[in-house]
Regions:
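N-terminal helix-turn-helix/winged-helix DNA-binding helices
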Residues: 2-6, 45-78, 82, 93, ...
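Short coil turns linking two alpha-helices in DNA-binding domains
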Residues: 17-22, 34
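Short beta-strand segments enriched in small/hydrophobic residues
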Residues: 20-23, 59-74, 184-192
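Short beta-strand elements in bilobed, periplasmic/extracellular small-molecule ligand-binding domains
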Residues: 91-101, 207-239
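Flexible loop/hinge segments that line or gate small-molecule binding clefts
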Residues: 127-172, 188-192, 265, 291-303
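An alpha-beta-alpha
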Residues: 173-216, 334-352
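Flexible loop/turn connectors
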Residues: 243, 247-354
């Protein structure tokens, strides 16, 4: 019978102490080691065929019915709406929620992810794609804890997803503007970086429709600089993007007939900048957002926005986790995942433009 590999064996092979091996293998999030040390220990464990022991629970005790939800911020009502959908369904099933607000801070996201090994929730939901540099880590966690992602997931990740077709949303927005005769338009967006591919997909979908109409050169794209995603001190950053970039746009041109915000929060900033410039909405310039958030429904808002049933997507993500818990397997086991979940809700407009 093959001898069971212990942390002491790994320590000898890696040339480090047994306590170092224990902390690295147990993913102690409050202790940091040199990257070389971590790699040495992980490689030694892999080569020796180390199998981590199953966690022991006290007799008669039950694992807490807990789900963890990762959010990039809680100032955009879109994420609050997703949370409401998740929490409503979780509550029906007797689960509690632990919300990790990463504020788009890579260090915070990494810290929360490493906490998962100790917290051991019954499921994890990402309300947007994990940051690119942590996709492998999320995949590793998904081997032991059910994970679901809301948004266009990375094709390299074998993790269940509720698909949000950002490209389609962009196309729908563009078609509506074209049908209304808007030829010269502007699109205001947050940073369009590799880290936030879903944003780029929405913009690309919009541009494709204008290109098909032979009007690609009539679309002005104004995207914020990447630094704004790091400026977590300002909780109203998306509103500021809309406001500041619209002021910049008005200094450059005055002949656009419509301005699109990537989401409602940006569109609110657009509207305030236009109001300050004494430009009437929608009489002079039409404004469009996306997500149909609470503020967009207020009586004095002349904002056209797209309803794509955000709360339902939250429920769907929670439903994936419940099904996976019930079937006692996670995404990367031999049994197929519940699905790469795709529920298509046909987007429709609210407060139509003129």
């Amino acid at each position: 019978m093959k001898k069971k590999v212990t942390s002491t064996d790994i320590a000898h092979a890696a040339g480090v102490s047994q306590s170092t091996v224990s902390m690295i293998l147990n993913k102690k999030y409050d202790v940091s080691f040199a990257k070389e040390t971590v790699e040495k220990v992980e490689n030694a464990a892999k080569e020796l065929g180390y199998v981590p022991p199953k966690r022991k629970t006290r007799k008669g005790t039950k694992r807490e019915k807990l789900l963890v939800v990762f959010c990039p911020n809680l100032t955009n009502p879109y994420y609050v709406m997703l949370l409401q959908g998740i929490e409503a369904h979780a509550k029906e099933k007797g689960f509690g929620l632990f919300v990790c607000n990463t504020q788009r801070d890579l260090r915070m996201e990494e810290r929360y992810l490493k906490m998962m090994w100790q917290l051991r929730p019954l499921g994890i939901i990402y309300t947007c794609n994990p940051s690119h540099c942590f996709m492998d880590l999320v995949g590793e966690i998904a081997e032991q804890i059910p994970v679901a992602i809301v948004n266009n997931q990375n094709e390299k990740m074998n993790v269940d997803a509720v698909e949000l077709d950002n490209s389609k949303l962009g196309r729908v927005m563009a078609k509506h503007l074209l049908e209304l005769g808007h030829r010269k338009v502007a699109y205001i967006a947050p940073p369009l970086t590799a880290r936030q591919k879903q944003r780029s997909k929405r913009v690309e979908g919009f541009l494709k429709e204008y290109e098909k109409a032979g009007l690609r050169d009539q679309v002005i794209i104004k995207a914020a600089k990447e630094e704004i995603d790091l400026d977590v001190a300002h909780i109203d950053s998306e509103y500021k993007i809309g406001y500041e970039l619209t002021k910049e746009l008005l200094n450059e041109t005055t002949d656009v007939t419509a301005i699109v915000g990537l989401n409602d929060m940006i569109a609110f900033g657009v509207m305030d900048a236009l109001y300050e410039a004494k430009i009437k909405v929608p009489a002079d310039v039409s404004v469009m957002g996306c997500d149909n958030t609470l503020f967009a429904r207020m009586h004095n808002m002349n904002l056209t926005t797209i309803e794509h049933f955000v709360t339902f997507k939250g429920r769907d993500a929670c439903d994936i986790i419940m099904k996976k818990i019930a079937s006692h397997h996670s995404a990367n086991m031999e049994t197929a995942p519940i699905s790469t979940y795709h529920v298509e809700y046909e987007p429709h407009f609210r407060n139509l433009l003129r």
